[in-house]
């Protein structure tokens, strides 16, 4: 029997207390977690390692979630299916338009544990059926 390889998750968010709480939850669930405080650092992390899931805040300094996703679409489209967005304002018209356009799942902050686990499970199931190509970020 092959050894169990833990799934890896990249959390991109600029709110330290939220990142700490989310990291603790994910690690308790058996995931290996790396964090980045903005989209630019998230892209750098993707150059170093592959991730099974990317949890990305929409509003951040330097490179926000929309710009991060646009970069993935151009340079690493196979990774787009692994993104789950986080936002404190999903009802804003610009956020609704973005979510409709990109077709990716999103979670409202603060997120329930059940919602986080459900979104991750759905992304992992879909990603299992598609190859992950290297990031040219």
Residue ranges, per PLM feature:
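Active-site residues of response regulator receiver
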Residues: 13, 57
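Acidic catalytic/metal-coordinating carboxylates
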Residues: 37-41, 64-70
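Active-site beta3 strand of CheY-like receiver
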Residues: 49-55
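Charged docking surfaces used in two-component/phosphorelay signaling
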Residues: 20-28
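Alpha4 helix (beta4-alpha4-beta5 surface) of REC/receiver domains from two-component response regulators
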Residues: 67, 89-108, 114, 118
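Non-catalytic signal-transmission and effector/linker regions of two-component phosphorelay proteins
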Residues: 1-8, 112-137
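Receiver (REC) domain active-site loop signature in two-component systems and cognate sites
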Residues: 60
